[in-house]
Amino acid sequence: MSRLNFPILLFLLCLPGLAGTVQAREFKSRYATLSYADNQVLREFNNNLRMNKKLRYSIRKKNVLTVADEVLAKVDIIIEKVQVVLDMFPGKYHIRLVVVPDSSDVARIYKKKYGKRVDHIAYYSLSEKAIYISADDASLRVLAHEIGHSVVDHYFKVRPPYNIHELMAQFAEKHVTD
């Protein structure tokens, strides 16, 4: 770094509001990039994402050291299960999973992107290949539903009609625990 740039960088770091900005944390797994603002939100999401006995057994095979590792292990297992349930195995499948504190944050993000007010606890953004989900309202079935949308989106070259998309996501949600 040149001597000229260092004072500029130091000045920018001292500006009010810049030093205290919240940085999103990101971690990647085989199928997902996990984004969240703070560890408390991630812990709540993890606690709400209760797995049944079969799915829990699969986590034991993973190298889990942190809460983020556990969440990513759960997400990868759910994705694989949804792909089996739908019998759809898209190539190059990767999504972004954005965990926010509550449904008001999901609604705020949706309003900003699409200009509509909604009361969703989660949604899948087709254009971003991203799932936005409330940590407060998270559950295995809610996440499986949104992953169902993402698997269908990645699988077909031409997107199926919305009603078909929704039926497949509901099917994934219902059968994720089979």
Predicted regions and their residues:
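Post-HExxH zinc-binding segment in Zn-dependent metallohydrolases
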Residues: 159-178
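Active-site recognition of the HExxH zinc-binding catalytic motif
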Residues: 141-154
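Acidic/histidine-rich, surface-exposed loop or edge segments in extracytoplasmic proteins
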Residues: 28-66, 151
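Boundary at the C-terminal end of the N-terminal hydrophobic targeting segment
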Residues: 19-24
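Bacterial N-terminal signal peptides that target proteins for export
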Residues: 1-8
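Auxiliary, metal-adjacent structural segments of Zn-dependent hydrolase domains
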Residues: 65-127
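Bacterial N-terminal signal peptides
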Residues: 9-17
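Soluble non-cytosolic domains of exported or imported proteins
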Residues: 62-76, 134-142, 158-163
